[in-house]
Amino acid sequence: MGMGSNGELKYEISQNAYIKLVLHSLRHKTAAVNGVLVGRISPKDDGVVEISDSVPLFHSNLALLPPLEISLIMIEEHYVAQGLSIVGYFHANERFDDVELCGVAKNIGDHISRYFPQAPILLLNNKKLEALSKGKERSPVMQLCVKDASKNWRVVGADGGSKLLLKEPSANVVLSDYISSEKWKDVTDVDDHLDDVTKDWLNPGLFN
């Protein structure tokens, strides 16, 4: 199957990319946060977008375009040597019970999809994240949103679990351990880096 409409695609996210985004949202629990998904289209031509890494972006002023554009260029330049690029967007809303895509998320998703038309938005679902701590959640704690034929963002419904796949089945178990050990305190985002350039947005030591 070639790369048809977004509805046919599957998105496979690696454990580290997935965990980093969730930890970032936990570090800034009372704020909206965002990040980008880094990866490539699977060379097997099997309709899979492989998300191999992620970069936590901001925890304040998410709607400001200049810092966003600077960040996207910086991220693209870093990953191009590895044959990877920005393939999607992650968003966590400020309110715990808010699972709607806000205007800011849609706008940034639109911006990224100009360069990578198959780009999804992954939206954090806090209720699923809460269920994780009780050992009840095996599927990703994120909702998959894609563009429909009329270019509007929509949440992929009940079958979303089959479209967004965790590359490593143990990802939620590992995430749960990291949450218990308060690993989220170690996450650095681009926001932190712009304030203090010694802080590394690549988070090289996070999973050591």
Curated annotation (Swiss-Prot):
Membrane-crossing residue ranges in chain numbering: none
Gene this protein is translated from: EMB2731
InterPro entries linked: EMC8/9, MPN
Domain of life of the native organism: Eukaryota
Sequence ranges assigned to domain MPN in this UniProt record: 11-146
A Gene Ontology term for the protein's cellular component: endoplasmic reticulum
CDD domains linked to this entry: MPN_UPF0172 (cd08060)
Lineage: Eukaryota, Viridiplantae, Streptophyta, Embryophyta, Tracheophyta
PROSITE patterns assigned: MPN
Name assigned to this protein: ER membrane protein complex subunit 8/9 homolog
Family: Belongs to the EMC8/EMC9 family.
PANTHER family: ER MEMBRANE PROTEIN COMPLEX, ER MEMBRANE PROTEIN COMPLEX SUBUNIT 8_9 HOMOLOG
